[in-house]
Amino acid sequence: MPRDIPATKGVYLLERVTNKEINLENIDEEMRMEQVRQAGAKLDWASFGQAVRRNLQEKRNTIDADGRIDVLKSLAFMKTKLPIEADAPMEEKIRILAESLGCTHVRTTRGWTITKPEELNVDLTIKNGEVDTVVLSFWEEAAFYSGEATKMLHKGEWSELRDRLASMLAVYNKDLDRNDRKTCKAAMDVLGSMLKTMNADEMYTSIQNNNYGYYLHRSDLRQGRLYYNVEPLYRRVRSKHHTYSLQKEDWDILPFFEFSFVPSDSVHAFPEHNPYGEWKETGSAKAAVCLKLSKGVLVSEPTRRKLHEISARSTTIQCYTNCYRYLTGSVLIKDNLKMITQFPGECTQHHYTIDRSSFTSEGDSVITEIYLKRLQDFHKVIEILRKEAMHISIWESVLADCYELQGLEERVVPAINMFVNLSRDMITVRFMTKYAPIRVCIRDGVWIEAKVEVVNDQTGAKVADRVDELLTRKLNETWSIPIMLTFAVSGEDCALEQMKVPLREENPETKLPTPTKIIVHKN
């Protein structure tokens, strides 16, 4: 029988407050129970019980369905990463290799064939129970014998081969439909032809100065790579070994990006083959161009905004940070950061005081992928990344020349006080000379270079054009503020301060890997 429950006019929650804090969990629980009581007042208890069971059943089914989807996704991902044991039976290795690539496999008179329609075909010739030859075909292209793949299987590197094949297939995302994939592949062929014509030679300086960098064309099991930046310091280090052009040992060290294509909500224009060899965007596809960076690239917030202007969607961000603080390692910055150069001998040192405000913003980031609307805009990305690399490297040069090794002998050195302010628009260095207060301003130039301007800090008047030209040339040759400033000022021009070094009793930056430039500098 229905139970008569009087309607409740109001809810009064009495909570004993301890330690002057409100127990929100108890309040939430009491409110939920009151909702149950009010719902029970409208139903007999039998109907109420049925409603509760029905509600719980719906939730359980929903949770189970979501759980099943997650499990299926996890299993699918695990299949792509399952290790292939070298000592497993041949049929087992073939099966795992095929399933992890989403392919079918069939036995042939000569061995095995692994196939994924329109994407991959692998023919394995078996002799005496071992793989004798590997013939590959990607995206319905002409088949070719792959010596690299054959050597890998002779060494038992089945898992490594699977990963390399998966990387090749990732150029065209599996979610692209057939027509869009064909359009993207045609665009990639046009790009490859253009880069073959416009490619720089393998000299480090040519790679740095060419609008399109240097394109290392695709190999059997490696995507094409576009190298876009070779810093002056790297060139100097390699020149000590009489190396001035790109070598195989440079391939995984120098920064590069790879091209791939991913689905997009919007339709974008793509180039197609033209009998006159012209770049004309006559094709279209619901796809975007992905530039996958070889490693995370540190960029400032203004630079990320520039990339956004030509992007189909937001860049892939690994983490947010402050780009200047990011490079200092674990040095604790409570106030203005103070550093002193480690010039050899009796040289006058530079004592830098970097304004603390330079390290407070958290809008900078480390990015790993850039998505373009138009394929031809990749050269704009090259220009943006080169300028950003130069800006970051200029700040890193201060860290490198001020790096204090553990166990330095305590001593007193003469130093020039310099005050530094860091921002993406301009780096300023201020110091007092016997003649006037000086401000050195460093900005991006028109081309991929920095521009230096030296002015009177009080009046803003330029010191001399020839000084600007000299310092601009030195900075672009070295990407180093300390080296550049040695041409701007000497101990005879300034009132020197006697500084006790090292500045820190211990160097926390040695506890973690130091920036690449510092490592190279130490060698």
From Swiss-Prot:
Cellular localization per UniProt: Nucleus
Q: Which UniProt keywords apply?
A: Activator, Nucleus, Transcription, Transcription regulation
Could you give one GO CC term from the UniProt record?
A: nucleus
Tell me, in one coarse class, where this protein mainly resides: nucleus
Question: Subunit composition?
Answer: Component of the Mediator complex.
Per the record, the similarity remark reads: Belongs to the Mediator complex subunit 1 family.
Role, per record: Component of the Mediator complex, a coactivator involved in the regulated transcription of nearly all RNA polymerase II-dependent genes. Mediator functions as a bridge to convey information from gene-specific regulatory proteins to the basal RNA polymerase II transcription machinery. Mediator is recruited to promoters by direct interactions with regulatory proteins and serves as a scaffold for the assembly of a functional preinitiation complex with RNA polymerase II and the general transcription factors.
Q: What is this protein called?
A: Mediator of RNA polymerase II transcription subunit 1.2
This protein's species is Caenorhabditis briggsae
- Gene behind the chain: mdt-1.2
